[in-house]
């Protein structure tokens, strides 16, 4: 018998179609170098994805529009953090130039 069993996996997702999509997407992520959420018994990324689904570490987002909004918010926060860092660097450069001008 294969582990994890299909019955156990179907308790974690709404349908077998959702299971296949989730497994495929997670396997692609793992192949692309995504950080695993646990230690695996399997070597293949497809079986590793099933292990993560079985353990509940990987789930389907219940509301796709909420997920998109969360991704947008994360990107916006990263952009704002980058702008703040650039502003601080510019202030530091201006301060150093000002101090250099006073010494001359």
UniProtKB/Swiss-Prot annotation:
Q: Its Gene Ontology biological processes? A: DNA-templated transcription
UniProt KW Chaperone keyword: no
What are the record's GO terms for cellular component?
A: DNA-directed RNA polymerase complex
Q: What is this protein called?
A: DNA-directed RNA polymerase subunit omega
Subunit info here reads: The RNAP catalytic core consists of 2 alpha, 1 beta, 1 beta' and 1 omega subunit. When a sigma factor is associated with the core the holoenzyme is formed, which can initiate transcription.
Its function, per the record, reads: Promotes RNA polymerase assembly. Latches the N- and C-terminal regions of the beta' subunit thereby facilitating its interaction with the beta and alpha subunits.
Any idea which UniProt keywords this protein has? DNA-directed RNA polymerase, Nucleotidyltransferase, Transcription, Transferase
GO MF, one example:
DNA binding
* Pfam families associated with the record: RNA_pol_Rpb6 (PF01192)
Q: What catalytic reaction does the record list?
A: RNA(n) + a ribonucleoside 5'-triphosphate = RNA(n+1) + diphosphate
Q: Belongs to which family?
A: Belongs to the RNA polymerase subunit omega family.
User: Does the record's keyword annotation contain Flavoprotein?
Assistant: no
E.C. number, please? Answer: 2.7.7.6
Going by the record, the broad EC class of this enzyme is: transferase
């Amino acid at each position: 018998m294969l582990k994890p069993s299909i019955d156990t996996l179907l308790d974690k997702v709404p349908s077998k179609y959702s299971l296949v999509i989730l497994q495929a997407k997670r396997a692609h992520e793992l192949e692309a170098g995504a950080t695993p959420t646990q230690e695996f018994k399997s070597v293949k990324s497809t079986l590793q994805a099933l292990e993560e689904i079985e353990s509940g570490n990987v789930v389907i987002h219940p509301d796709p529009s909420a997920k998109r909004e969360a991704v947008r918010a994360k990107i916006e926060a990263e952009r704002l953090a980058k702008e703040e860092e650039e502003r601080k660097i510019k202030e530091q450069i201006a301060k150093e130039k000002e101090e250099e001008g006073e010494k001359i």
